[in-house]
Amino acid sequence: MSPDGELVPVDSSAVVTAKRKTSQLSRSWISIDATGQKTVLDVDKHVIMHRVQIHARDLRILDPNLFYPSAILGRERAIVLNLEHIKAIITAEEVLIRDSSDENVIPVLEEFQRRLPVGNEAHGVHGDGDLGEEDESPFEFRALEVALEAICSFLAARTTELEKFAYPALDELTLKISSRNLERVRKLKSAMTRLTARVQKVRDELEQLLDDDGDMADLYLTRKLVGASSSVSVSDEPIWYPTSPTIGSMISRASRVSLVTVRGDDETDVEELEMLLEAYFMQIDSTLNKLTELREYIDDTEDYINIQLDNHRNQLIQLELMLSAGTVCVSVYSMIAGIFGMNIPNTWNHDHGYIFKWVVSLTGTFCIVLFVIILSYARFRGLIGS
């Protein structure tokens, strides 16, 4: 309705645009808990921020429409994970993943559903008598391991695929230098440079975590949660009972395995996470080494091609030198012929016809000898010949 009280028709395109903006604000998330149960959450960012207690800047890192480098950030109650197409938030009881249309995310979701409930299944099969065989790793570590394995395998597969096309193309270029082969190698080199930057960023992020025990300690979400529950239980306040059975079982299991991990110096014990990160650091470092070897092979191929081009250039210079020497000799011959061909009165022109034969013969012989002398001097100086 207009300010004058008249009815104004509603623009259908504006309604569609408004609905589209609303759908973008309430982007879908996929939640996977410790039992492998997948739930689709169609909520806005404020609900997610309140759910996992992170800041807006942390959530902005996971926006697929914005470009942010790979990062693993430890927060009070969550781990913010941005590894290429894997954009997730890991808590002590669930994993929240962006509902992306990327086809590479679907296998990661299936892997989360398959591997996250492994500890519970093992406990159900073996019973309480075989606690030693139960997977006692915290939930966040199992989720982090799935994500790291997925991204390392993804980058390794891209590297293998690049090697599959790069090495034959480089070998073909060494055999035949053509515009088609050069353009093909140029595209492969550009792809290798981009892939190397992506692998390098993931490697640097893991290396940064390994170098800082404090950052690794921030990733122990279950330990911090157990410590908070223990401090509450020993106080005069009523005992806090976790409403979630999943988080309650994790607290009891973590307390049963190591009761003292939340007290004293054990709070800085990051050996378990360090071994986990080191394993995938070595894997991503191996992938980076393959790319480095490929870059060195490309550099060697470029050097070989430059040597071939220099050789052809030297051959052209030698040919130019020989043609220049021949041109000098022909010029001398033409000069002598021009002198005798001038229309100048000369006594030699009378009754001395045999002189023409001597002049032609001697001049031709002189030019040939001069040409041989020039080439011999050039060969002696190393200017031609090899």
Curated annotation (Swiss-Prot):
One of its GO terms (cellular component) is endoplasmic reticulum membrane. CDD domains: Mrs2_Mfm1p-like (cd12823). It is a multi-pass membrane protein. The keyword Transport applies. Disruption phenotype: Displays plantlets with retarded development under low Mg(2+) concentrations growth conditions. GO terms for molecular function: magnesium ion transmembrane transporter activity. This is Magnesium transporter MRS2-7. It comes from Arabidopsis thaliana.
